[in-house]
Amino acid sequence: MKAIKDSAIYLFGELISRSVPFLLLPYLSRKLGVEGFGELSYYQTYLALFLIIVGLSQEGAIARFFYVYGKRALNLVVNAGYAYTLSIGSVILAFCLFFKAEMLAYLALSAIFQSFLAVQLSVRQCQKQAVAYSVIQFLSASLSAGITVFMLEMYQTELVEKRILAILFSNLLVFLFAYLLYRQKTRIKSFNFRQYKTALYYLLGFGLPLIFHNVSLFLRGQLDRIFIYHAFSEAELGLYAMGAQIAAIVMILIQVLNKALVPYFFEGLKQQRITLVQVQRWARYSLLLVPIPALIMWFIPEPFVVWLLGSQFVGTKYYIVLFLIATTLVVPYLILVNYLFYHGQNKSISICSVLTTLIYVISLLGLTLTEIQFVPLASIIGAVSILPVLYWMTAKVGK
């Protein structure tokens, strides 16, 4: 019963906290305008890239360490990870300052504190502190929104920079709050240099192999913004990025449902109540769901979208429709990939990830040479192309 209650708290907290940035979209679209929103989405790609480098999947390493080795030396791994993040983050920061890239320096600092915060959230999740986990998440999202509104109302220029600073300040403040609570509840032990070195090797051993996978996810999720920024105007990127942002609301719902259903899915596979035939049938039937969100969006009048986002965002509806198709294609993907995860086919999943990325990047390169209206098709091509491969792999595993 406690497991169900905790799961409900986690899911509710995640849904609420991840909804806050989307509730902020109409405000940001009006304050930044279409060009400013395009510029912001471009800089956010660097934040995602820096986070991969300084984070090194530490939250996953912390979770594995806790469940495999226990909590006695957990603080050792946490501190070793923080030392790594500070070291690598300082190198990135030094490059930014050397090249006088002030905005990138803010993003590097934000990535450092966001990585710190992700580790704190992982510790709470491992220790089954569902309420604390949800409170920290909600505090991070709401504080970021609050500081953003405050700064954009206080200043009239360099508004993209102010939004980035708001993200930085919220990451810093929430991390300090979470870390102070962590220190109060953690028995501090002294460790020697050799133990810290061992902990660092553990983190590197866990995180480095995942770099390629994370970079693949980055390329599929962020590379298009960089290409569009250099090939088209900031205004066109703004429309494109807004369409992707709104379609991502459906992705949140899919991820929340996936997180809630995976334990029952795995349990059904373990007890053989769920078979490969059923899994593949569900994947096929889920394809019928793919056009539904896009069709609903298609019937929503364009003037309503413009009223919601602002007069500069005429044409955003087109991008929302296309990105909704690409997003909903995640449903059959998750059904098939969860089956492979259960059977420990991580290598097969990695191969699929690399293959999808290659197809996506090639499609993106080709479509970027045409018109921006065709660029979202790269996401659909990448999402569709991987499904037959996953279907074949699940059939191979189920034999």
From Swiss-Prot:
Keywords: Cell membrane, Membrane, Transmembrane, Transmembrane helix. The chain crosses the membrane at residues 8-28, 36-56, 92-112, 131-151, 164-184, 199-219, 237-257, 288-308, 320-340, 349-369, 374-394. GO terms for cellular component: plasma membrane. It is found in: Cell membrane. InterPro entries: Polysacc_synth (IPR002797), PolySynth_Transporter (IPR052556). Belongs to the polysaccharide synthase family. HI_0867/HI_1700 subfamily. This is Uncharacterized membrane protein PM0507. It comes from Pasteurella multocida (strain Pm70).
